Amino acid sequence: MFSGVYTALITPFKDYKVDFDAFEKLIENQYKKGVNGIVPCGTTGESPTLSCKEHEEVIEFCVEKAKGKMKVLAGTGSNSTDEAIYFTRTAKRVGCDGVLVVSPYYNKPTQKGLYLHFKTIADTIDIPIVLYNIAGRTSINIEPATVAKLFKNCKNIIGVKEASGSLDQMSAIKSLVPDIELISGDDALTLPLLSIGGIGVISVLSNIIPTEIVSLVKTFEKGDLKEAVKIHYKLLPLVKLMFIETNPIPVKTVASLLGMCSADLRLPMCEMEEPNRLKLEKALKDFGLLK
């Protein structure tokens, strides 16, 4: 359902408000470059600093602009189960193809708590759900056994975005539930994950170079592993620089350097340190993206 390349969209700001003009251009560029779908209101989209109203507006705007062109997998997670249900219901109402639900952050629930959180959302709203495991942000790992239990007991939980960084964990999930849609949440691990049965990536770097990320996945799908490996290593330096500071600071800085939108962030995210900015500029020039 959500195979291929999905872009974890940045949320452009101007004067501290969502810049919908720039947003529309970003979405159109993704469509023209051949991605399969977009993911608004995720980690890269600065969802924690969007107001409830903005969160809803961004999701609805993306559905409106992407309709008939590509799928929308909206971020609707929260550390409050009730709030996650609210955003998921909004996504269903406005016509999203599915939702990406991050594990609750800060609360540090047990595995039982995680199971009940996701199951309650799935039982309340009938929409395809992709779990989002990113323990580095949330402080809690969704264990493979919990993923398997949710997949077995909730017909609309169809996949997991894996950003644990552990191929062991990803392999364990696929072993327990071979039919689950296993999606990379880390650009550096897209090719390795594809090789063990993954179906695609929710990419940060595809905000900047969607064509190349699409090429990587399609080349692997065609069976040309040698060429896919070449693309992987070509992209790797840029992938690493996307995390030279906390995401989405680097990717927004790059988007600004390329004239796509402003580099404005909302506190506590802040402007990139100048030495890191210079490293980004050099990498973009080396890659031929900046003169």
From Swiss-Prot:
User: What's the family?
Assistant: Belongs to the DapA family.
Q: Which InterPro entries match?
A: Aldolase_TIM, DapA, DapA-like, Schiff_base-form_aldolases_CS
List the catalytic residues. Y132 (proton donor/acceptor), K161 (schiff-base intermediate with substrate)
Q: In this UniProt entry, which residues are annotated as the site Part of a proton relay during catalysis?
A: T43, Y106
| GO CC list | cytosol
The record ties this protein, via Pfam families, to: DHDPS
> Could you identify this protein by its name?
4-hydroxy-tetrahydrodipicolinate synthase
Q: What are the protein's UniProt keywords?
A: Amino-acid biosynthesis, Cytoplasm, Diaminopimelate biosynthesis, Lyase, Lysine biosynthesis, Schiff base
**Cited HAMAP family:** DapA (MF_00418)
KW tRNA processing (keyword) present:
no
UniProt pathway annotation:
Amino-acid biosynthesis; L-lysine biosynthesis via DAP pathway; (S)-tetrahydrodipicolinate from L-aspartate: step 3/4
- GO MF annotations for this entry? 4-hydroxy-tetrahydrodipicolinate synthase activity
Where, per UniProt, does this protein localize? Cytoplasm
The record's subunit annotation is: Homotetramer; dimer of dimers.
Instruction: List this protein's GO terms for biological process.
Output: diaminopimelate biosynthetic process; lysine biosynthetic process via diaminopimelate
Q: Main role?
A: Catalyzes the condensation of (S)-aspartate-beta-semialdehyde [(S)-ASA] and pyruvate to 4-hydroxy-tetrahydrodipicolinate (HTPA).
Catalysis performed (reactions): L-aspartate 4-semialdehyde + pyruvate = (2S,4S)-4-hydroxy-2,3,4,5-tetrahydrodipicolinate + H2O + H(+)
Which gene is annotated as encoding this protein in its UniProt record?
A: dapA
Task: Give the EC number.
Answer: 4.3.3.7
Q: Could you say which residues bind pyruvate here?
A: T44, I202
